[in-house]
Amino acid sequence: MKIFGLVIMSLLFVSLPITQQPEARDVPAYDRSEVTISPAETPESPPATPKTPVEKKHAEEINKYIWGLNYDKNSILVYQGEAVTNVPPKKGYKDGSEYIVVEKKKKGINQNNADISVINAISSLTYPGALVKANRELVENQPNVLPVKRDSLTLSVDLPGMTKKDNKIFVKNPTKSNVNNAVNTLVERWNDKYSKAYPNINAKIDYSDEMAYSESQLIAKFGTAFKAVNNSLNVNFEAISDGKVQEEVISFKQIYYNINVNEPTSPSKFFGGSVTKEQLDALGVNAENPPAYISSVAYGRQVYVKLSSSSHSNKVKTAFEAAMSGKSVKGDVELTNIIKNSSFKAVIYGGSAKEEVEIIDGNLGELRDILKKGSTYDRENPGVPISYTTNFLKDNDLAVVKNNSEYIETTSKSYTDGKINIDHSGGYVAQFNISWDEVSYDENGNEIKVHKKWGENYKSKLAHFTSSIYLPGNARNINIYARECTGLFWEWWRTVIDDRNLPLVKNRNVSIWGTTLYPRHSNNVDNPIQ
């Protein structure tokens, strides 16, 4: 994972956990009987209300039940993507003045994600302290929240300057609405008391990228939230597979702050006194669906960017990296042209704009200006939930989603048509023999070579003779031979040039001159084709 100090852009999200108020200092309303501020440093777990004998019995049974669940935390949250059995063969095709060779290789990706991305469609299910089942629904980013009575919990925020007293809040009844009110209270407390001392809080940037080849591969990389994201990004997997475009997907998490939940000292601490083991069993809490809780939520902005180029160059990724980082490519014509002729599409979640999701298209030259917007947190630039972390309730261990997928990596290379320019100005009769191989591929990807010859081979040419031989992009192993007639009985023909297995170039200039006894030649290249 790369950490870039990039600044992302204006993001949107309607269901904000931090409500923007008409006046800057208005604090969101909440039920003070449910959300209270701890008067002193809060202990590791919030103080529990004394339990009745029945409630103690329920707690003991819940602890015994959850502690007794037998599951493998390393295999319970797994996304298994596509399995590749057949790799399509190598192929080539003519495209205008180029011959394109497309090659495919089997690849695999294995990604462990502790943070699960949030997008608007599921944000209502996500809040700090939520009790969820660690199962397929969580892997699919559709957490199944347990509808049970909850005990109190303590939230904390990591905004700078806040004391241990101010950065925590005690939530008596942690329903979603009460938790969101508590989050608003914590953040507004910082806005009121600490924002002047810390006027420019730069967001923490979490950056990752992946050249795109299949949806399954990108889901394994970025999580199952990418399914919904791609409805807007529209990665062109068909064109990528055909070798017609190269696309890269980049994910930015611009994190303003994290809301954390204190770890419970035992599983029962997260349940109200009336909740029983039988209720949990009836709700499907078992070894296949063990309980977990959202231990941390990151608030900020999430940006997904698709970079797209029709270039067949192997420098496309380098060009994309330069465009994103602002690195100068002055002097590198190839990188400059790739950047100039590439485009991007950005899907942005969060921020102060009115729309839920903002979608922006443009060329790469405009992208960095967009990314520079909204680099710091303030009241007018609020964050939204962009990712969350879950822990198993049994032992507070981190619940890591393991994403695996195989995919076909497609690479393409273009070979531009070229030509050989012949110039004969020598004082003699000359003959040429020019030949080459033209390459193609059969249905199994095996290379087929067809030998080709110039139609004027071994025809006598007098000075001054010029001609151009046009070669297709799939021409290989070019041979150029010329001889001159000396008039000498013992050496009637003398070799002037004999160059073999030459590469295809845009312009190859072959000249012969001189006399019968002293023939000369040159073989020069203009604009070599890489």
Curated annotation (Swiss-Prot):
The keyword Transmembrane applies. Residues 36-55 are annotated as: Disordered. Its main location: secreted. It comes from the Bacteria. It is found in: Secreted; Host cell membrane. A motif (Conserved undecapeptide) lies at residues 484-494. The chain crosses the membrane at residues 215-228, 235-244, 313-322, 330-342. InterPro entries: Thiol_cytolys_C, Thiol_cytolys_C_sf, Thiol_cytolysin, Thiol_cytolysin_ab_sf, Thiol_cytolysin_sf. Residues 1-25 form the signal peptide. Coiled coil: none annotated. Changing residue 489 to A: Doubles toxicity, increases cholesterol binding about 3.5-fold. A cholesterol-dependent toxin that causes cytolysis by forming pores in cholesterol containing host membranes. L.seeligeri is non-pathogenic, perhaps in part because this protein is about 25% as toxic as listeriolysin O. Mutating a single residue in the undecapeptide increases toxicity 2-fold. After binding to target membranes, the protein undergoes a major conformation change, leading to its insertion in the host membrane and formation of an oligomeric pore complex. Belongs to the cholesterol-dependent cytolysin family. Homooligomeric pore complex of 35 to 50 subunits; when inserted in the host membrane. This is Seeligeriolysin. It comes from Listeria seeligeri. The lineage of its organism: Bacteria, Bacillati, Bacillota, Bacilli, Bacillales.
